[in-house]
Each structure stands twice: as C-alpha cells, then as structure tokens.
C-alpha cells in the first residue's frame, strides 16, 4: 500500500508552475533547514494573520470579483471579503502560501497588489489615513503593499523607538504599529530575497 501511494497522489500542475514542488525546496533560515512551504506559511501568518489570501470579494455595490480590480474601480473604498449570506454559495479564489511566496519572489508587482497587511487599531488607521480604504473582513482591515509603501520609513522609525520599550510596557497602539512595521520589513526581505 505504501509503495502505491506515491503513484496515486500525483497532483496536476496548473499555470506552468508546480507550487507544491517549489514548497518542498529546502532553505536555510534562522540556522535551520526548512521547506519553503513552512517559510511561506509562517511569513504569511506573521504578515496577514492567516495562511491563505482571498483573491475575490465584494465591491461597494456588492459586485463580486477580483479585489484589486474592484479596488481600482472604487478608489479602494467599500471592499469586503464576503458577506454572511455569501458564505454558503460563494467561495472566493484563494492563494496557497507557496503560490503567494512565489509571487512575492518572482512577480513582486503582482504580489504588491494583494490585500495582506492587517491594521486594526483605529488610531493607527487614522494616522495613516487608511480608515476608508482597504478590504474589510468582519471588522479587520487589510491593505496592499502598494497602499502601505508610502509609510514604510515612518513605521520603521516608529518600530525603532517602540523597540526600546519592554514588550509588556507597550500600549495597544504601539503593539499595532510595531507589528505592522515588522510585517512590512518581512515582506520587503522576501520580496528582494532573489535579487
């Protein structure tokens, strides 16, 4: 039975890239050898707080489609992942962590348009003037790297100042700003890792 399993578990390659095989490639990270799939999953969890990226959702007029295209039509406002009533009959296309990592490394211009950066603190949203844009998912807000890029240096400086405080002494705003800055730095490291 174990000899037959590999023959039965062949997967079909779509879109020219075998993301499952890519995910099995070993990399040295933090002094340990890990498969790229683990790097992708852990990175996506740190950045987005989830392991898969929804590619589709609702526009302001409840039009269903590609989130980035809907964002362009509506100036980034009024986007949601899916309403409760849609949960039972609309399943958004989602990007597997390894597919996302391949995009980040090989097609960064495409990856920069994915809504992965989570910001939930109202004061931070107001400071960055992002409260009316992004994608809403049950009260959580997600943004693209394109939307976050103007704030990279500001958040990096904030992280340096906040990092001097003990983690237990940080207020919710500082924790949110620190986490967002870390997510942006991690994304940038991944984005330029093959260059």
Which ranges hold each PLM region?
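...captures the hydrophobic TM-helix bundle architecture rather than a specific catalytic motif
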Residues: 1-3
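Soluble extramembrane regions of membrane proteins in the secretory/endomembrane system
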Residues: 6-195
């Amino acid at each position: 039975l174990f000899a037959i399993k590999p023959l039965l578990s062949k997967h079909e390659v779509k879109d020219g890239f075998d993301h499952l095989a890519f995910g099995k490639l070993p990399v040295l990270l933090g002094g340990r050898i890990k498969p790229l799939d683990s790097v992708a999953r852990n990175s996506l969890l740190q950045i987005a707080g989830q392991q898969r990226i929804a590619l589709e959702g609702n526009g302001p007029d409840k039009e269903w489609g590609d989130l980035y295209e809907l964002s362009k039509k509506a100036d980034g406002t009024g986007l949601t992942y899916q309403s409760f009533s849609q949960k039972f009959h609309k399943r958004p296309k989602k990007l597997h962590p390894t597919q996302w990592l391949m995009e980040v490394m090989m097609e960064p211009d495409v990856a920069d348009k994915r809504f992965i950066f989570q910001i939930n603190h109202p004061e931070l949203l107001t400071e960055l003037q992002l409260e009316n844009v992004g994608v809403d998912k049950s009260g959580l807000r997600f943004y693209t790297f394109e939307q976050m890029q103007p704030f990279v240096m500001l958040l990096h400086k904030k992280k340096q100042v906040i990092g001097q405080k003990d983690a237990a002494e940080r207020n919710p705003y500082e924790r949110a700003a620190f986490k967002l800055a870390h997510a942006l730095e991690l994304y940038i490291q991944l984005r330029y890792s093959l260059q």
